[in-house]
Amino acid sequence: MNTALAQQIANEGGVEAWMIAQQHKSLLRFLTCGSVDDGKSTLIGRLLHDTRQIYEDQLSSLHNDSKRHGTQGEKLDLALLVDGLQAEREQGITIDVAYRYFSTEKRKFIIADTPGHEQYTRNMATGASTCELAILLIDARKGVLDQTRRHSFISTLLGIKHLVVAINKMDLVDYSEETFTRIREDYLTFAGQLPGNLDIRFVPLSALEGDNVASQSESMPWYSGPTLLEVLETVEIQRVVDAQPMRFPVQYVNRPNLDFRGYAGTLASGRVEVGQRVKVLPSGVESNVARIVTFDGDREEAFAGEAITLVLTDEIDISRGDLLLAADEALPAVQSASVDVVWMAEQPLSPGQSYDIKIAGKKTRARVDGIRYQVDINNLTQREVENLPLNGIGLVDLTFDEPLVLDRYQQNPVTGGLIFIDRLSNVTVGAGMVHEPVSQATAAPSEFSAFELELNALVRRHFPHWGARDLLGDK
């Protein structure tokens, strides 16, 4: 046990009291992202070190690892606390998404350290999908780069509203206020094109030296703002899902014996209470909530983000992938939607292709009807393309094999987020965020069946010399 943790437990009056205090702290999930070698892993290592979250054996191991793999000369290489893969240590880069946990007296934190290299952008999107705040690192010597713009856009696309622009390595530019101001203005010019109402803050720091990370820097008297840790401890996070209508995707039908039948899952948004009238989609059958069962016993009500099991008063047909919502809410099932896609496979996404998709516990198939545009990350302009390449981001039209109940991703990430799965390899090849569900009334009927369209795409891809025409036409 490290000395800081031991002191906290002693101050709280014992382990049990300390654990209760931890449960009542708010939790902030954030990620670090930016271009390669901007110091993301070093920053996380510095946060863990300066908040005294490192155990003595870890510190001893870090001294030894710094001698073998370190890139900071005689100094401790704090990035090694996070870069766990052997390939990462040998190359001095981050490849996988690394998660770390730490806490202070004010708040608990879960950190996702994401890769900076462009070829690992898909890993970065994975890390951002569960976060509420993004720390965007910028090398003070290089300024705003393409990968900085890419990560900023992906973060906002995935619903992150709080951006902290950490201008790192200020020690290498002599802690220049002019450099900080120039980069700040450059980023704000770019950020004006980002979607949504964003909370953007700027902190000049040196992760290697510890300036403005957990304590105020004496080398930058011109900066009077908060340190990075103070920003993380005080930022107010308003969860969108709390104010949204009730959504409960069924993940598992729990029937341990003949006397109990419950529907387990995580409440995606809103709240549910005993006695509430609920409706099951897509069947439309209604019932009342008889019990809300949790690990700690029965509850009278539950809120977004809580894992619960609902018991209904009636025995009705409900299976994995069904959605429960308030009975008085009208939410029609749709068979088409426009989806913002981050593509993660070497094989490009092309019109006519079909994939398995998973959304809120539901698994079905979807066909790509067309690609409206791909976003140019450098200037956020939209351009027409025939396919979406690896790490490409664009708006895609999908048609599903069966009606689905969808929300816009910005309203509800659970019922609006989906993944694409290759049907042969079973590998996840893309992430999608529902931009707009297309109602049945406005969806244009297809002249051809899903099988005919898929066969047509297969023939055109593998036998182009046959000259088969595109059945999708101008779609």
Curated annotation (Swiss-Prot):
Q: Where is this region: G3?
A: 113-116
Kindly list the GO CC terms recorded for this protein.
Answer: sulfate adenylyltransferase complex (ATP)
Q: How is its activity regulated?
A: GTPase activity is coupled to stimulation of the rate of APS formation.
Q: Where is this region: G1?
A: 34-41
- Reaction(s) the record says it catalyses: sulfate + ATP + H(+) = adenosine 5'-phosphosulfate + diphosphate
Entries under PROSITE patterns matching the protein: G_TR_1, G_TR_2
Q: Where is this region: G5?
A: 206-208
Residues holding GTP:
34-41, 113-117, 168-171
Segments carrying the region annotation (G4) are 168-171
Asked if the record carries the keyword Chaperone, the reply is no
Q: Where is the signal peptide?
A: none
Write out the pathway annotation from the protein's UniProt entry. Answer: Sulfur metabolism; hydrogen sulfide biosynthesis; sulfite from sulfate: step 1/3
Q: Which GO terms describe its molecular function?
A: ATP binding; GTP binding; GTPase activity; sulfate adenylyltransferase (ATP) activity
Alphabetically ordered keywords of this record: ATP-binding, GTP-binding, Nucleotide-binding, Nucleotidyltransferase, Transferase
Chain ranges of the tr-type G domain: 25-239
Which Gene3D superfamilies does the record match to this protein? P-loop containing nucleotide triphosphate hydrolases (3.40.50.300), Translation factors (2.40.30.10)
Known role: With CysD forms the ATP sulfurylase (ATPS) that catalyzes the adenylation of sulfate producing adenosine 5'-phosphosulfate (APS) and diphosphate, the first enzymatic step in sulfur assimilation pathway. APS synthesis involves the formation of a high-energy phosphoric-sulfuric acid anhydride bond driven by GTP hydrolysis by CysN coupled to ATP hydrolysis by CysD.
Concerning PANTHER family, the annotation shows:
TRANSLATION FACTOR
The protein's matches in NCBIfam families, at most eight in alphabetical order, are given as: CysN, PRK05124.1, small_GTP
The protein, known as = Sulfate adenylyltransferase subunit 1
Q: Which species is listed as the source? A: Escherichia coli (strain K12)
